[in-house]
UniProtKB/Swiss-Prot annotation:
GO-annotated cellular components: cytosol; endosome membrane; fungal-type vacuole membrane; PAS complex; phagophore; phagophore assembly site membrane
Cross-referenced PANTHER family: WD-REPEAT PROTEIN INTERACTING WITH PHOSPHOINOSIDES WIPI -RELATED
Annotated InterPro entries: PROPPIN (IPR048720), WD40/YVTN_repeat-like_dom_sf (IPR015943), WD40_repeat_dom_sf (IPR036322), WD40_rpt (IPR001680)
Protein name per its UniProtKB record: Autophagy-related protein 18
Free-text comment about domains: The N-terminus might form a beta-propeller domain involved in specific binding to phosphatidylinositol 3,5-bisphosphate (PIP2), leading to the association of the protein to the membrane.
Gene: ATG18
Annotated GO biological process: cytoplasm to vacuole targeting by the Cvt pathway; late endosome to vacuole transport; pexophagy; piecemeal microautophagy of the nucleus; positive regulation of vacuole organization; vacuolar protein processing
Function: The PI(3,5)P2 regulatory complex regulates both the synthesis and turnover of phosphatidylinositol 3,5-bisphosphate (PtdIns(3,5)P2). Necessary for proper vacuole morphology. Plays an important role in osmotically-induced vacuole fragmentation. Required for cytoplasm to vacuole transport (Cvt) vesicle formation, pexophagy and starvation-induced autophagy. Involved in correct ATG9 trafficking to the pre-autophagosomal structure. Might also be involved in premeiotic DNA replication.
Keywords noted in UniProt: Autophagy, Endosome, Membrane, Protein transport, Repeat, Transport, Vacuole, WD repeat
Motif stretch (L/FRRG motif): 309-313
Residue spans of the WD repeats: 19-57, 268-308, 313-352, 464-508, 518-558
Comp. bias regions, Polar residues: 162-171, 405-421
Length: 568
């Protein structure tokens, strides 16, 4: 039986309603976030997110370590943990859940770390190889040799095909024509005809994975005419930038799975990567390093760095980064138990007056800044640190319209004390208080908020007298919204996705008040009101789904709307 609970008020005092009866070995969303696949010690299960319902349960069998769906079709890829006799973590099975049949199976030379599916490709990641298959015929198209990647870090963009993705996992999608089998990494011979899963003629699917920590790899790509970190720079500049950082391990290779050729190398971080994600249309790449303090967003076509956000001050393990379907937000989860939401591409009018002035002067003074700060840049880039001082790294020079760092992302709590009736700094628009969850208020949080506010005010005063590179240290771009996962367990891993469709939900009236106008009585706390929210779905390794509401106008603290348990 499925266990579910609507969050009580205040929401963050809720406790998990039931401990799942079976260990969760693997949990993930499908490509559009409409379903959740869970692998456990008895098999695997599939749930829909809205509404939360179990729509498929596999027959009891071997423990499953990986389960991946193709949108909401009946095609499922599973890999066993290999704990039972006859099962192996090197064996991949493609299953038609509607027919209950195995379409084909493939055996690889080493343990399978990750599987990714698009409408046209299947990507199988091993420790030192990546296999690319045509999903309609299961023909091996290409093999990529990589550096050791035990963390299984890779990302793929969903090609823009015309597959019907209804919310029913029982929808066969015309995938599979009956049982078939194969063995060996390149011997898949099953024919999986599909009338509605053929990608559009202009669709593109990109694969992103860590670059080997060798300059020879970059040099070979340059010889082949591949861009490294931007198409606007010359090969000489690219080679110089690589040779100056021979120990870089945070670069990302973008690979075109249609042409089967590398597209570019993006210099994302100096330290090792912890998580990467491609937007569904393949235009943007988000990255986080193992330092866990900085999140960056790049243009895939040019390699230019478009956004840089401060996730936190102290290092932590980042579990996942994900784009919203409309590319307006980036969602990150980490070992701290906090989920951060960063906003992309807000209107220029949301920028503060000082940021606009610096942006307008950037092209005029870039030559002087480069000359004046070259020595400092070299020192900072040589230290290998990706924490606080990493903000001083030079940004790629791109048009201001393309970058558009959002004012709302600068600090969710900056205007909390001003009230909704306060005017913006330029006197044109009223400030809107971000949502505040009073259950999350603590002395440490208030002190941190005050120090950030003072820091931003100091940066605004000094910004006109400092080059933009130095000003970015004092005035980092922070999250637009955040939430604290309501799990009682520690060391819980999590992943999250954000739905870009606005939903009207009933929430406590207390969330409409500013800090100074917080409701004083329990009766006021229980009163409900309707709010237009975006839903954030968070799943945790202890077997729970949390649904939070994000106010797209105010940001701030997200509201816990639902809590469900995978009773498997």
């Amino acid at each position: 039986m499925l266990k579910s609970q609507i969050a009580p008020i205040p929401s963050y005092e809720s406790q998990p309603v039931h401990k799942p009866s079976s260990s969760v070995n693997f949990i993930t969303f499908n490509q559009d976030g409409s379903c959740i696949a869970v692998g456990n010690n008895k098999g695997y299960s599939i749930f829909t997110t809205n509404p939360f319902t179990k729509c498929y349960d596999s027959p009891p069998g071997e423990a499953i370590g990986i389960v991946e769906m193709l949108y909401s079709t009946s095609l499922v890829v599973v890999v066993a943990l290999g704990e039972e006799t006859g099962s192996s973590p090197r064996k991949l099975k493609i299953i038609n859940t509607k027919r209950g049949s195995t379409i084909c199976d493939l055996v690889f030379p080493s343990t399978i770390l990750k599987v990714k599916l698009t409408r046209s490709r299947m990507i199988v990641l091993l420790e030192e190889q990546i296999y690319l298959y045509d999903i309609s015929t299961m023909k091996l198209l290409h093999t990529i040799e990589t550096s050791p990647n035990m963390a299984g870090i890779c990302a793929i963009s969903a090609d823009q095909g015309s597959t019907d993705t209804s919310n029913s996992a029982d929808n066969s999608g015309s995938i599979g024509s009956g049982p078939a089998s194969g063995s060996g990494a390149g011997s898949g011979s099953a024919s999986m005809t599909s009338t509605d899963s053929t990608p559009d003629a202009q669709s593109h699917s990109y694969l992103a994975y860590p670059s080997p920590p060798k300059t020879a790899m970059h040099d070979s790509l340059l010889v082949a005419g591949i861009n490294t970190n931007g198409g606007s720079h010359s090969k000489q500049n690219n080679i110089q930038s690589v040779s100056n950082a021979p120990n870089r391990v945070g670069d990302v290779i973008i690979f075109d799975t249609d042409s089967l050729q590398p597209l570019c190398v993006i210099e994302a971080h100096k330290s090792a990567l912890a998580a990467i994600s491609l937007s569904s249309d393949g235009r943007l790449l988000a990255t986080a390093s193992d330092k866990g303090t900085i999140v960056r967003v790049f243009s895939v076509s040019t390699g230019a760095k478009l956004y840089q956000f401060r996730r936190g001050t102290y290092p932590t393990k980042v579990y996942s980064v994900a784009f919203s379907p409309d590319n307006r937000y980036v969602v990150t989860t980490s070992a701290s138990g906090t989920v951060h939401i960063f906003r992309l591409g807000e209107d220029e009018s949301l920028e503060s007056k000082h940021k606009r002035k610096r942006a307008s002067r950037q092209h005029e003074t870039i030559a002087e800044e480069t000359s004046a700060t070259q020595d400092l840049d070299d020192e900072i880039e040589d230290d290998g640190d990706d924490s606080d001082v990493d903000d001083v790294e030079s940004l790629e020079v791109v048009p201001s319209k393309q970058r558009k760092l959002s004012q709302g992302s600068s600090n969710s709590y900056t205007s909390m004390n001003s009230g909704i009736s306060g005017m913006s700094e330029d006197g044109k628009e009223p400030k809107i208080d971000p949502i505040v969850d009073h259950a999350r208020l603590s002395v440490a949080r208030m002190i941190r908020r005050s120090s950030q506010t003072l820091g931003r005010k100091a940066a605004q005063k000094m910004g006109d007298f400092l080059p933009s590179k130095f000003a970015s240290i004092l005035e980092p771009t922070r999250h637009f919204a955040s939430l604290k996962i309501a799990s009682a367990s520690k060391d819980v891993k999590s992943i999250a996705v954000l739905d870009s469709q606005v939903v009207h939900d009933m929430v406590p009236q207390m969330f409409l008040h500013s800090k100074d106008a917080a409701p004083a009585s329990a009766l006021d706390t229980q009163s409900m009101t309707e709010m237009a929210l975006l839903h954030i779905f968070v799943v945790t390794s202890d077997g729970y789904l949390y649904v939070y509401g994000l106010d797209p106008e105010r940001g701030g603290d997200c509201i816990l709307l639902q809590q469900h348990s995978f009773d498997i």
